[in-house]
Amino acid sequence: MNIINILDCDSILCILPNLPDADKIKFISCCRDLYKIKPIIKFDDYYHYANMDKLGMVNQCRNLIHIITDDNINQLTMKNIRYLKLYTQRQFIKHKLPINITKLEISRIFEQDIGPFIPDALEELILCDYDKPIRKFLPPTLKTLKFIHTHKNVIKHQIAPNVTNLALGDYDGSLGKWLPNNLKYLDVGKFFRGKIGLNIPTTVETLILGDLFNSSINSLRNNIRVLKLGNSFNKPIDILPELLEELYIGRGFNSEITYLPKRLIRLEFDNECIFDHPINVLPNSLRIFKLGCFFNQSIEKCLPNGLIKLKFGDYFNKPIQKTVFSGCLFKTKKFIPDSVRVLKFGMYFNQNVNGGLPIGITKIVLGSHYTRAIRKIPASAKHIQLEVGFRMASMQHWNNITHFKIYYSQYEYYKDVLPEHEIVNNKTKGLTNYKLIKIKKN
């Protein structure tokens, strides 16, 4: 039945504003009659003005990005332009920029004094090597200020007190009282190497430390909830803020971790992280755990109950279970908690998983070197991603599986062995080298 016969046009137009832009297109693509309302749909994401102009959809976009260059310097600025980029050396601005512009980016080649022309409702300002004084012109609505390639003396004198999100770009000086008192997000910049701790405001909740930072973090304020450590950080972790909920660790870290906060929810190592030490201090609050490429330690008595997503790196190849004698019987003891729903193994994992998978698992990813037959898949598992080298013969035991994601080359080799299936949208995001297939059930 056509959806138009169920919902009238007015009802559909009430539904569409509540959907993401991609879902709006999918929704109206259900039938030809519904697709006819495309010209009156409004889109909410950011889109480049030039692209939408070619498609004739400028008036359908609420948030446009417009790049001003020497070629389009006299082009009319429309009311639905929210993000303006100034990429020209010519001094062409004669009046205050329109109030509809909430995000402004000034490139390093822009030479005009922009201060008097900053729009009154500006919320975000990005300065690329811009050294003219503008602080007195910044409106009280400004919340986000980002510096890129800007001298440290310029930075200190450009920050308005109402800024809550601050990124310092190439800054390599010291931190201090010049930081806004209401700051919540602080990115100290990729070149920052100084001391950090009580010299940042008590309001900071998210702290990003750059790739050259390798100083002590033992003095960080307890109010920090999100902490990202750069690629050069390699100090032992034995003290962290008590309220920390998310911790991200860069690829150069290979020191011991002897303490993690009790409220930590997310712990992620960089994909290329060289960390390879036992971790025995994971808190019960942890829900997402992602390990780096070189981690290859035992996980027995390591993972907490309550963990939902678990991802191992390419070189992990340790057992995930063991057989123990209990009473008069031999039983399998699993190392991965049953709470895990999404489990991903890396390229070189090739251990037996029969009986060792969590009973609540819904998605499993197996690497290209996995060659063992799998005969025990929990009934909850629906999605399996397979890579080159996997033994397709074991699929006969997987009656509950509904979807597979496999390499194109593997599919061509095994397509006659697969159960009856259909191809599901080869152009799906993230499926560049894969086919997603759906198993047909009798």
Curated annotation (Swiss-Prot):
SUPFAM superfamilies in alphabetical order: L domain-like
Entry keywords, A to Z: Repeat
FNIP repeat start-end pairs: 213-252, 253-294, 295-348
Top-level taxon in the UniProt lineage: Viruses
Pfam families: FNIP
InterPro entries (UniProt xref): FNIP, STK_FNIP-Repeat
Disulfide bonding pattern of the chain: none
Protein name: Putative FNIP repeat-containing protein L170
